[in-house]
């Protein structure tokens, strides 16, 4: 017979033992009862001590009887203290066992649920599924790359030639901007001689005037 069976009077192989919750509650009730007994004995010890002091000098026989009763109460109190310690230890152990039982029960329930969830799963099928997902992702990436590439629609150009032409245009634009910043180029004019041009000879001019006058006279007399 188990200790719990001996304590609570359950016996026989066919007898059903108390549940952990019932046993824990009974132990708590026992602790409460013993605590009240402790309080009662402590009061009795105080009373007997008062009685012994009261008859200490007047009635030694009554004082001795009071001290004997006090000793018996103290012995009972010590026994109850030990019993309470044992019951408290047993209750804590039973509570821990009950907690462990509940934890294991819940873990077992979770394990069964996990097993049921995995019953229709095959690791090979999972691997195949993950491989299919990876293949589809790779295909999707290839399609995205193909779509993002520019299409020439039959136009085939030399990239190097186009780049060279672009650089030439850029250089022309830079030169043009540079000229606009510096202003129009100043064209140097020919040097002007410092000395004055030689004047026409006065004599030659007079001769020309005389010739003109003679021609005029000849025309008038003709």
UniProtKB/Swiss-Prot annotation:
Location in or out of the cell: Cytoplasm, Cytosol; Late endosome membrane; Midbody
Stored Pfam families: Snf7
Keywords: Coiled coil, Cytoplasm, Endosome, Membrane, Protein transport, Transport
GO-annotated cellular components: cytoplasmic side of plasma membrane; cytosol; ESCRT III complex; late endosome membrane; midbody; multivesicular body; nuclear envelope
Region annotated Disordered, chain positions: 1-21, 177-222
Principal subcellular localization: cytoplasm
Topology within the bilayer: Peripheral membrane protein
UniProt xrefs under InterPro entries: Snf7_fam
Domain of life: Eukaryota
Coiled coil region boundaries: 21-182
Any one GO biological process: mitotic cytokinesis
The protein's role, per its UniProt record: Probable core component of the endosomal sorting required for transport complex III (ESCRT-III) which is involved in multivesicular bodies (MVBs) formation and sorting of endosomal cargo proteins into MVBs. MVBs contain intraluminal vesicles (ILVs) that are generated by invagination and scission from the limiting membrane of the endosome and mostly are delivered to lysosomes enabling degradation of membrane proteins, such as stimulated growth factor receptors, lysosomal enzymes and lipids.
Subunit comment: Probable core component of the endosomal sorting required for transport complex III (ESCRT-III). ESCRT-III components are thought to multimerize to form a flat lattice on the perimeter membrane of the endosome.
Family designation: Belongs to the SNF7 family.
Name recorded for this polypeptide: Charged multivesicular body protein 4b
Organism: Xenopus laevis
